[in-house]
Structure formats: structure tokens, C-alpha cells
Amino acid sequence: MKFQSILSTATSTLAVGAAFLAVPAFAQSTGAVDFEEGAIVVTGQTQNGVAGVKLPNTSKAKQVLTQEIIQTQVPGQTINDVINLMPGVSFQNNDAFGSGGGTLTIRGFDDSRISQTVDGIPLNDTGGYALYSNQQIDPEIIEQVNVNLGTTDVDSPTAAASGSTVNIRTRNPFDDFGVRFLGSAGDFGFFRMFGEIDTGVLNSSGTKAFFSASKAVNNTVYGGIGEIDKTQFNAKIYQPIGDNGDFISVAGHWNRNRNNFFGSTPLRTDPTRVVGPDSSNRFPLTKKERFYKIADCQIPAGVTGVADPASSCGSLYDFRYNPSDTGNIRINSRFTLSDKLTLNVDPSIQYTKANGGGTVDAREFGYERGVAAPISGYIGGKPYFNGVDLNGDGDTQDTVRILAPSNTETWRIGVIASLRYDINDFNRVRVAYSYDRGRHRQTGETSLLKSNGFGSDVFSDNALADADGNILQKRDRLSYAILHQVSGEYTGDFMNDRVHLNLGVRAPFFKRNLTNNCL
């Protein structure tokens, strides 16, 4: 039985990790993990206070970080910031705490050209292939992360990766019962709690599981008006089959972000201007000016019988929410069919709902130009409600600022299946099939702002309708991204293991179906 409780503080951290170990080369899918042979040696050593990582001696350019290094970083930090330790990897974090997003590049390729997976399932957005680091899995349950520099595994289910592959592997449940709690606190109101429970082995067949949860909040580092709020749950059940390494594991993940953006300032230095993110502001010139404060605001009440103009309250980027709900269920499995034949099957399902916020000046009245009678609709980038009192002042003459996010809801299913055949002790082949199907529903409903300028309904689920009950939205489309891929791989050892040869071929077949319901 294990109990562990840790309290740590965090503002900004320079972490130095050292590890001397030999680990298996965990790749993307269970089949890729099973196919790779031998040990990759990863060494970390301290040199002038900077952690060093050596390239593994393999046929592919790879770098690996394990929990020994990951656990030395800031608690709750996104794994994309942790792999910043690797040569060739560059990650620019939006804040010091890991929940505010960032930008990843590897050897010059941006995140739309980098494939990132967790336990074999792809994390790139199926629309534009972007990565969102604020939605990454908690680092405490990551066993290791390996980065293929400039290569992908042949069964990689991606239509975009031409740069590198970042493969995240979560740990398996421990054999013994255990409980762990970690707490962190720091500047900008940062506070995070993480807890996990391992059941230990539950029965004679070896079933075991773990469950974890975390909550992290902090104030936005610029502007002083927004907040970062992240909640995450993870679970994994592992069932060994026999004593030859066969198994089935089922893992689940849910992540909820309710974050505000923090905007950038104009690249102007006019001394007559005030520091801030508005177009009339300027860039900070001193360290003290970096921590500018955005003033609170109130939307004025409408006046009956007057054509009220839209308030500017809530228009700044810093008032925007960047909400997201993401989850997945993933299965990994290995089945030995004979002494030479092994089957791996990894199915998964994912869900995402997110938007980038934004507001628009809505018209309570109808659109009149070039028509016989006023009409409603989203026209010229503006919603015309044609007779709806949005601000409650008893008339329909006003222009009112409302929330107008661009929502994307995605359901994604996938499977990676591979069959490995061991020709002899020195040669093996593998054939694989990968399927990935993403359903994207993209809409642009509107909803009201609260009196302080922030959105009252971050996804606009209670969407505003015109006088005839029609939902007004700036976009309304449905698309499917469908990938079928077949691949094959050969690996062989020659000259008493002095030469290792790896050959692979992949043939992806990708199509996208789009239905646009907007006129």
C-alpha cells in the first residue's frame, strides 16, 4: 500500500533532469511498440545547469523522455513544454503554468505538420491539423514521450504529418494499491490539485486500474482581467491475457477548459498613448509597464425610443473565452496467434467542442437595402434580427454587442490494426491498416453578453433567434475527413547485430466531404 502527498510552489521554473536508463522504444500504436526490437538508451546529464539529452542509436532519429525527467518539471505543465528540453524541439508557452496554450515547432515544421498521439490515437485537429497544448493529458500519468525527428511510423493515421511525430504513452496501473496527491501554488493566483488512485491487482486474472483528476486555475498573465480554468479526469483499466505479454487496456480521458485569452499590444511606442491591447494603445517600454491592467466595464442599459449604439464593453480580445470540452476512449490490445504471428488492434473514439470566442454588433431591426421589406439574416458579417429586443429596453431600434463564437463540434473514430510475422530471430515483417474518420459540425450561433462584457453562454447553446424563430449564425456546415491507409514494414538485423535495417511503405487514401448550408 502506497500513500504519497506532495506540496510544491511554482512561479517560473528552470528544471534540470538527469536520467540514466534503458527503455523500450514505445512508438505510436501498440503494433508499432510491439514491432520495434531492442533497447533505446536515453541519457540525461547536467552540464552547466542545463539538462542534456542524447540521441538514441537507432535507425530513426529519436529522442525519449521518461517520467524521471517529466516529474522534475512544473506540476501540470503541458508535455509540449517538457519536450522543449530536446534538441530540435521549440515550444513557446503562452504562460508559465501550461494551461494557456502555446506554439510548437520541430526542426522548422509547425504543429500542423507534426503528428502528435497519445497511446496511438491522433491528437491533431482533423480540420486544420493544429495542436492545442492546453488540452494535453496530465504529465503525472505519462510514462514516456518520444519524438521522431522528421519521420513517422508507417501506421501513423495522419494525412498531414511531414515533419515529426510526438508519441505520448500513458503509464499502466500499478500492481499495488496506492494514493497520491499533489498541490501547487504560485504567482498570478495559480493553484493546482492533482490526485490519483491505483487499485492494485484486483483478482487472479491480474485486472488493475487507476483513476486520476486534476484542477488548475490562474489569472491571465497580462491584462489582469481574465482567468485560466482547467479540469481533467483520466482512467485506465489493464487486463493481461496469459503470461506471454498479451493484454487489453481501456483508457478514458476528459478535459474541460474555460480560458480567457490575453491579447497582444500594438507595436507602437507613441508616448501620448497608454499601454494596453486596444488599437489606440501602445507597446510597453519598461518591465513595469508589461503588467498593465484592463479596466472593468459595464454595458449601459438601453433607453426606450432611442437608437442606442453598441457598447465597446466586451470588445477587447481579453474578454473572449476560449472554451473547450475534449474527451476520448482508447483501447490498446495485443494477441499472440502463434509462435510467429501477433495481432494488435487499437480502436478509439474522440469528442471535441470548442471555439475562439468573439463578439459582433447585432441589429435589432431588419436589413433594408435593396429589398422590398426588412429581412432578417446574417448579412455582411452582421446579424439582423428584424424585430427582436435584444437589450430589453422595449424597442427594436438598437445596435447591441453580443457573443458570436465560431463553434466546432467533432466526433472522431479510428482504428489501427496490424499483423506481425517473425520470419526468424533476425527478420520480421508487419502489415497494418489505419482508419480515421472525423465528423465536424461547424456553426456560428450568437448569445447575449453579461453586463460586465463577458459571455454568459460560452458555446451559445441558448442561441438567439430572429422574430420568426430562426437561429441566426455566421456559418453552418458539416464536413467529414476520412482516411484509409495500408502500410507495410520490414526490419532485419545483419552482421551480428552491427547493421539494423528498417524499411516501410505507406499508402494513405484521404478525402473530405463538405456540406455548406449557408447561402
Question: Each PLM stretch: what is its role?
Answer:
Residues 38, 102, 162-164, 177, ...:
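Hydrophobic, lipid-facing positions within transmembrane beta-strands of outer-membrane proteins
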Residues 43, 48, 54, 80-122, ...:
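Extracytoplasmic beta-strand/coil segments of soluble accessory domains associated
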Residues 136-180:
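A beta-strand signature from Gram-negative outer-membrane beta-barrel systems
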Residues 183-189, 199, 215-219, 241-243, ...:
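Transmembrane beta-strands of outer-membrane beta-barrel pores
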Residues 325-355, 386-519:
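Face-selective signature of the C-terminal outer-membrane beta-barrel domain
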Residues 36-74, 103, 111, 146-147:
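N-terminal periplasmic "start-of-domain" segments of outer-membrane beta-barrel proteins
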Residues 164-201, 211-225:
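Short strand-turn segments of transmembrane beta-barrel domains in outer membranes
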Residues 220, 238-240, 245-330, 355-408, ...:
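Acidic/polar loop-and-plug regions of large Gram-negative outer-membrane beta-barrel proteins
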